Amino acid sequence: MARVGVLLMNLGGPERIQDVGPFLFNIFADPEIIRLPNPALQRPLAWLISTLRSSKSEQAYRSIGGGSPLRRITEQQARELQSLLRQRGIDATSYVAMRYWHPFTESAVADIKADGIDQVVVLPLYPHFSISTSGSSFRELQRLRQTDESFRKLPIRCIRSWYDHPGYVRAMAELIAEQVRLSDVPEEAQVFFSAHGVPKSYVEQAGDPYQKEIEACTTLIMAELENLLGYGNPHSLAYQSRVGPEEWIQPYTDQVIEQLGEAGTRDLVVVPISFVSEHIETLAELDIEYRELATEAGIVHFRRVPALDTYPTFIEGLADLVGSSLEGPEINLDEAAKLAGRVKFYPQERWQWGLNTSSEAWNGRIAMLGFAAFLLELISGHGPLHAIGLL
């Protein structure tokens, strides 16, 4: 029997306050998150942004206990998925690959090779594909394949997205139904889906299918919810977590909450649709920030649907996905990362400091130039960082 490695890909998160700055640096150093015309600027800019944002982010993590639970939950998901797959007769071992914090993708790949795995199923824990989530993780795997001959020889099957998978849709509907039934008048409860946003340019210029998949997923979940409850609920969809000056896909979560309050909504059932684990966006942004906003807007009951975590229906759905991937047509890394639109992909190679004397000089000049601009803006109180809310 072939030994199957199931590679669960996720974002990662700082487990301690002192990890917040390095974690943010890793995010902003990813060219799929901030796209620059000159790759040499990537790391200096990542350092600058992570330095400026660390204090605010540290405060948010302190508000939820001092660190992200994402790794712990993802490892629990991996263990339960592995157990269920083995019960189904699949000789599977689960591995966790985080994009921006430990355990990194390189570590998971090293474990896969050390364990003598025969083939790999790549399962991103993002139901909906986006350049900045699944896309970036697939591209990191491509980079590792190019630089590691033994890993390159290993057969890989990818699951690109699974927003429409019955197990996922059913699990979401079941958890929503539990919260709707708690309302004073359940059939009048407003089901409010909040998804992580992405820049509008990703969708319109790069062909990112994320928004279409989110909208289609919402429709599927509401249909399943109506089947469970026997009645339909009003619902709405918005996008959260936007940063910077660029326009993101709309409507925005904070604006829709205010509009619902003005319209007289009393019972709000909030659904974190693009998150399968509890982390900073659910525990701080939704549970604290948006709960306060809803109260100010006049909404009486704010009920947040828990993230899927290790909910049995969800784990069963993940096992079904792995089984279908093994039995169905192969989707390789190139196919999984492909986009319909024209977009320039930037190399995922980590930019090395000090490759030679010339590069060291340019690194120093760039860093000094950025630092000088930063000091000038601090002194003057005006500049692009103030304009986008970083200072």
From Swiss-Prot:
EC number: 4.98.1.1
Highest taxon above the source species: Bacteria
Molecular-function GO terms, alphabetical: ferrochelatase activity; metal ion binding
Enzyme class: lyase
A GO CC term attached to the entry: cytoplasm
InterPro entries named in the record: Ferrochelatase, Ferrochelatase_AS, Ferrochelatase_C, Ferrochelatase_N
Keyword annotations of the record: Cytoplasm, Heme biosynthesis, Iron, Lyase, Metal-binding, Porphyrin biosynthesis
Swiss-Prot/TrEMBL catalytic activity: heme b + 2 H(+) = protoporphyrin IX + Fe(2+)
Gene Ontology process terms (BP): heme biosynthetic process
Keyword check for Cytoplasm: yes
Pathway linked to the protein: Porphyrin-containing compound metabolism; protoheme biosynthesis; protoheme from protoporphyrin-IX: step 1/1
Binding-site residues for Fe cation, renumbered to this chain: H196, E281
Functional summary from the UniProt entry: Catalyzes the ferrous insertion into protoporphyrin IX.
Family: Belongs to the ferrochelatase family.
Protein name, as recorded: Ferrochelatase
Species name: Prochlorococcus marinus (strain MIT 9313)
